[in-house]
Structure formats: C-alpha cells, structure tokens
Amino acid sequence: MKKLLLLSALLIISIFGYTQTAITNANIQTAVDLWDSDLSAATTTYGNISDWDVSQVTDMSQLFYHNPDFNYDIRNWDVSNVTDMRQMFYEASSFNQPIGNWDVSSVTDMSYMFYYATSLNQDISNWDVGNVTDMVNMFGNAESFNQPIGNWDVSSVTAMGGMFYYTSAFNQPIGDWNVSSVTYMGGMFYAAESFNQPIGNWDVSSVTDMGYMFSYATSLNQDISNWDVGNVTDMVNMFNTASAFNQPIGNWNVSGVANMYAMFYYASTFNQPIGNWDVSGVNDMSWMFHNAGNFVQDISNWCVSNITSEPTGFSNGTQNFPENYKPIWGTCPPLGIDDQNLTNISIYPNPTDNTLFIIGNKTPIAFSIYNVLGKEVLCIKNTNNINVQALPSGVYVIKISDGVRQTNIRFIKN
C-alpha cells in the first residue's frame, strides 16, 4: 500500500511538475534575481513570473532596481497588500507592461517608482493612490510617459519634488489635483519641456520649497498669479530657463523667502512688475536676473538690507535693465505715510553730472541724499535744484519729505 502511494505521488509530480515555493517578503527579491539569471531554475522553483501569487507581499521597494532588460507581463499580480513601491522600477528602462488594473490602494510610498523607466507609457489613470504620501521623483526621467492621471486623488501626498523631473513627453491636465497637503515641490517640473497645463487653481499654501520647480520647463506659460506662496522659503532657480514664462506674479507674498538665487536665470521672456515684493528676508539674489533679456522693471524700492552689495551676476546679460531700477544694496527704503500723494514729484536729469532739478513740489520740502550704504551724504531744504557735483560717481537715493509724507527716488551721479 505504501509503495502504491509513493508511486502515485511521483506520478503526480511527473505530470504537474515540482511543488513551487510561495512568494513572500522574505524571498521575492531572490525570486526576481533568479528569474533574471536563470529563467529555467526560477520557473521550476517559483513558476512563471506572470502567475506568481504575491498577495502576501507588502514590500516591493527596489524590486526591479537597475534591471534594464526586465519587461515581463505582471499585470495579474495581486499587489493589494503592498505598502511600499519606492524605486520599484528604478532604471527598469525596458519595462512597458499594462499594470493599470493593479490595486495599489494600500501603497503609501511611490517615490522614484518609475525613475529612469524610459520606455514606460501605460495607462494607470484608474490607480487608487489615495494613501500615497510620497511621490518624489515618481516619474523622474520617465521620458516616454504621457498618460492621463488628472483624476488621481493625491490629497494625502506631502512630497512631489521632482515628480516630473525630465519627464519630457508629459503634458496632461492635472489642474484639479488637491495638493493642499504638499510641502515639497522642489524640481517638480524640472525639464518637463512639454508641460503647459493650467495649474493656477492649486492650493499651494502648505508648500515651503519651490526651488527649481519650473527650471527648464520651456513650454510653461500658465497663470499662477493666485498662488498663495506665503509659506515658501526657497525659490532657488524656480524659473531658471523657463523661457516661455511671462505671467503676472507681482502680488505674490514672498515675505518668507530666504533664497532667490538664479530665480529668473535665462527666463528670457519674463517681464512682469514685481517691484512691490517684500524681499526683506532674502539673503541670496546671486544670478537672479542673469540673461533675463526682456526684464525691465523698477525694483529700486526693494528692501535688501540683508544683501550689502550687488550679488554676483545679479543682472549680467540683461542689457536693457537700467541701473536706477536696481535696489540700493544694504538698505531698506523707508515707507512714507500716504506716499502716493508725493508721486507727482520727479527729478531730472537722471543720471546727472552736476545738478538735480526737482519738479512738482508746491509746499516746503526737505531733501536728504543717501549713498548705497544708507549713509546720509547731503541734506538741503526749500529749493528746486540740488548741486551734487561734489558727490562721487555712483548710485544714490534722494528722500523727499514735506514733514508728513515722503517718497524715495533713486538717481545716478556720473
């Protein structure tokens, strides 16, 4: 009887093959690695990868990491228990299989998921990403990807930095996304050269980092004037080489920003009035308008007391940007009471060699002239012309006051 049972077991094995090893968190990476190195052994041990039962797996992070040849059909995988998919297809440059029916509702981390998955262009619009909190560089360098994901529920996501970094084909409407929880958008559309969709209604009030956000996004020219950027501290390179962008952002509250390094570097089209920005907290404006060739706006009243001298490359190559439109470095121009009532006053010529003439004053007025260090160098009253011949060549600010109101005008002494 025992011999009969043994023969029956051997017969079953010979017909149906060897018993396959179950896929778990502990062995799934080993199984994938074996599939890559020895397809026959992997099939014998685990079965065909398309049919693997991965329903008990919770961690698929880096599963196909740096696996440029992998392109097998895994559409039927049950990933409903997976919580971590970060870097899952990182540098899986050949992968382009339909995985749009996956149940990813348990996943919380999709950062770098398709980073350098350069062939991927599958419809994943039906994915439930409602529990995902991290999408940093999710499609970074996924240069072929251009699928409609505008209906995704991204309300739990807090980090989208680099999400479409070098995703050069992507140009899908995502203007209805709820990004109110996002704090990090640094480099989000860096070199997303096709993207030009309306995102002006986004609630970005939680965002603190917008550095490099639209760098090299050469097609972008959408109205984002209503964005609440009051919590942003970093705008480094934000519009660097965003060569099409020219939208009114002069009403932005940038009072919390500390760094505007190269913010409009090579933003060759931009020419919007931003003279009312409160930049008093900014510590670095190096290269801010470098080769921003169209920019000709008066920002002379900016409060730049944190920056004692003209930053490196501030407006290099911006040939039409007048010197008297620049801030007075190291100073914070005082704000006058009812300042607009003195705007009928003007000075000429500017620049001047010897004498400044004041026009428009009808009441006794006092004049104080300050150098770029904020030091008063000349004070005079009740005259319509001021002899400045003795002043060294340079940039100055003349404060004009009637004792109650005041205004400040910048001039250049040749």
Predicted regions and their residues:
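Negatively charged
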Residues: 18-335
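Bacterial Sec-dependent N-terminal signal peptides
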Residues: 1-20, 379, 397
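Alpha-helix initiation and N-capping motif
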Residues: 3, 25-28, 350
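C-terminal outer-membrane/trafficking sorting elements
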Residues: 340-414
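Intrinsic-disorder/low-complexity peptide segments enriched for small residues
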Residues: 2-9, 83, 118, 218, ...
